[in-house]
Amino acid sequence: MTLTLIAINVLIFVIMVVKGVSAIEPRPEDLLLWGADFGPLTLAGGQWWRLFTACFLHFGIIHIGFNMYVLYQVGMTTEFLYGRAKYLFIYLLAGVGGNIVSLYVHPDSVGAGASGAIFGVYGAFLGFLLIRRSVIPKLAMAQMVRSAVIFLGINLVYGVMSRSTDLSAHIGGLAIGFVLGCYLSHSPAAVRNA
């Protein structure tokens, strides 16, 4: 499922570029035409589908490149832990939820990107580590927690310093993913895969 999600994101980006959208720095108007999130359209215009479609659009090749690299890194492990269906559920709900939080905090900004969904996958991974910690060897647990904390710390600090990073979508996705991860970690698939 992780590879499928990466392929979908990349395919949409390539189609957008072929259709004339800049690969380096897409204009907000172009992203809106493709389904980016934007308060006046999503809320006032009743175009709620934008909460979903925005999860598959990106602000340029660097944005999608970094997002897909991170999704691959954390996604493969998290997918193994939860199984395909639950993993997809986490990804989509965290992405949409992150966009809802972003819309609440920045109603007049154009929002796009898989970051909320990816932070949700990270949150689910951390939820699994918390709930299933008794079955994970201590050294492996320490390495995984350290790696996750470094990644999240760097991204959250960068998000505070960068005006172009939607920290609210990141935090919203992370929180939703963590809650879902804690809940779903009690499932038989998660126990079997531990």
Protein language model features and the residues they cover:
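A detector for small-residue-rich transmembrane helices and their helix-helix packing motifs
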Residues: 1-194
